[in-house]
Amino acid sequence: MVKQIDSKDAFQEALDAAGDKLVVVDFSATWCGPCKMIKPFFHSLSEKYSNVVFLEVDVDDCQDVASECEVKCMPTFQFFKKGQKVGEFSGANKEKLEATINEFV
């Protein structure tokens, strides 16, 4: 399941609640073509990796979160463990997304 983040507080709470689990954050926008293309794959990964927390942040709805996380383009995927960012990449690259999850799990 992918959790929609709607505020900076909700983002921090989700990171805190994850504990030792890997957190994968998809920063996207409704008007972004590549974001729309990879979204179903991102959701399918959330079913496949039940021990990983998947979050979605709409950069237009949560500009403060996107700014704090220094998101420059969409889609950007960031990876967190114990509240700390451990990885990041931009672009709708399915293979890289799954490989990066496997690297940190």
UniProtKB/Swiss-Prot annotation:
Keywords assigned by UniProt, alphabetized: Acetylation, Activator, Cytoplasm, Disulfide bond, Electron transport, Nucleus, Redox-active center, S-nitrosylation, Secreted, Transcription, Transcription regulation, Transport
Catalytic residues of the enzyme: C32, C35
Modified residues (N6-acetyllysine): K3, K39, K94
PTM characteristics: In the fully reduced protein, both Cys-69 and Cys-73 are nitrosylated in response to nitric oxide (NO). When two disulfide bonds are present in the protein, only Cys-73 is nitrosylated. Cys-73 can serve as donor for nitrosylation of target proteins.
Site (Deprotonates C-terminal active site Cys): D26
Membrane-spanning segments: none
Biological process terms in GO annotation: positive regulation of DNA binding; response to radiation
Site annotation Contributes to redox potential value: residues: G33, P34
Cell compartments where the protein resides: Nucleus; Cytoplasm; Secreted
Domain of life assignment: Eukaryota
Gene Ontology molecular function terms on file: protein-disulfide reductase activity
SUBUNIT field: Homodimer; disulfide-linked. Interacts with TXNIP through the redox-active site. Interacts with MAP3K5 and CASP3. Interacts with APEX1; the interaction stimulates the FOS/JUN AP-1 DNA-binding activity in a redox-dependent manner.
Annotated organism of origin: Callithrix jacchus (White-tufted-ear marmoset)
Disulfide pairings: C32-C35
Designated name of the protein: Thioredoxin
